Swiss-Prot record:
Organism of origin: Saccharomyces cerevisiae (strain ATCC 204508 / S288c)
Transmembrane domains' residue ranges: 47-67, 84-104
Miscellaneous information on this protein: Partially overlaps CTI6.
Protein name: Putative uncharacterized protein YPL182C
Membrane topology, from the record: Multi-pass membrane protein
Protein's cellular compartments: Membrane
Compositionally biased spans, kind Low complexity: 9-34
Keywords: Membrane, Transmembrane, Transmembrane helix
Region (Disordered) location: 1-34
Superkingdom of origin organism: Eukaryota
Cellular component GO terms, alphabetical: membrane
Length: 127
């Protein structure tokens, strides 16, 4: 009776050993996919950097239509995974720049408004 139980116990670890070996082969494709995605993202980051740099030049020149250059992102190819990742990374990088641009524009308008208010007060005092 003891011999069949020990043989049954020894057969179950063999089955368990087969299962981890089959599961160890399945993590290999995700690691390959991860490395290929990493390669795609490393390829798209320079594209995003160039587009963002062009937009920063537009913003630094205080172009009032610099916000409309966001629509130029739609001209990028979005059919493949490269285009999708490029648009996503450009959106992530472009949104803070647009918000900063709006804040600078609002602050500049506020500063000019205060300047006009000070000029009008100075002109009003001598009268």
């Amino acid at each position: 009776m003891k011999n069949p139980e020990s043989s049954g116990v020894s057969s179950s670890p063999q089955i368990q050993r087969v299962s981890p070996s089959s599961s160890s082969t399945s993590p290999s494709p995700p690691s390959i996919g991860t490395s290929s995605c990493f390669t795609l993202s490393s390829c798209t980051l320079p594209i995003a950097a160039v587009v963002v740099a062009v937009d920063v030049v537009d913003i630094m020149s205080v172009d009032p239509l610099a916000m409309t250059s966001a629509f130029s992102i739609s001209s990028l190819p979005t059919t493949g995974p490269l285009g999708t990742i490029a648009v996503d990374s450009i959106t992530l990088l472009y949104t803070p720049i647009c918000l900063c641009y709006l804040l600078v524009r609002l602050r500049k308008v506020n500063f000019e408004g205060n300047k006009l208010l000070m000029v009008s007060v100075v002109n009003f005092v001598p009268l």
